[in-house]
């Protein structure tokens, strides 16, 4: 979660959201989650690009035309976000449930929580990548020790 907070601060967000968790997982030096994401063609840059495209499409749905224009980059916040958004609370809840307790929580559990989100920025962005998210979810579940995720 420390890396997710860093991601949120880099984008100037007042809260840590699901996209920050996903970007943090993609940048995680821990091999399991990185290999799982790579197996689906989802490296950190591809995820970032999908999030940017989702943002442009959301603006378009609100009537803001950005075709042919480059969006300004995010401004880093001087203050670290101290709050978690609802999407992160869901990720943590699902991750802890998959791990059976907080002490066993690993990045793969959080990735499973991210992949189980049904609505919001991250599911829309991941859909834009064309990655087989059902297969990725199955691979994540298989990677968990003793198949702890049974709920």
Model-derived regions: residue spans:
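Histone-fold recognition with a strong bias for associated Lys/Arg-rich disordered tails
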Residues: 1-151
């Amino acid at each position: 979660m420390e890396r997710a907070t860093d991601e949120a601060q880099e984008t100037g967000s007042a809260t840590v959201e699901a996209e920050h968790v996903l970007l943090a997982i993609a940048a995680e030096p821990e091999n399991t989650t990185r290999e799982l994401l790579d197996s689906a063609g989802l490296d950190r840059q591809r995820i970032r690009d999908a999030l940017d495209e989702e943002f442009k499409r959301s603006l378009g749905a609100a009537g803001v035309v950005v075709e042919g224009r480059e969006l300004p980059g995010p401004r880093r916040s001087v203050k670290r976000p101290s709050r978690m958004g609802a999407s992160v609370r869901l990720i943590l809840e699902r991750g802890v449930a998959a791990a059976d307790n907080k002490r066993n929580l690993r990045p793969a559990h959080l990735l499973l929580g991210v992949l189980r989100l049904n609505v919001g920025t991250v599911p829309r962005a991941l859909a834009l990548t064309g990655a087989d998210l059902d297969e990725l979810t199955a691979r994540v579940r298989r990677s968990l020790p003793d198949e702890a995720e049974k709920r």
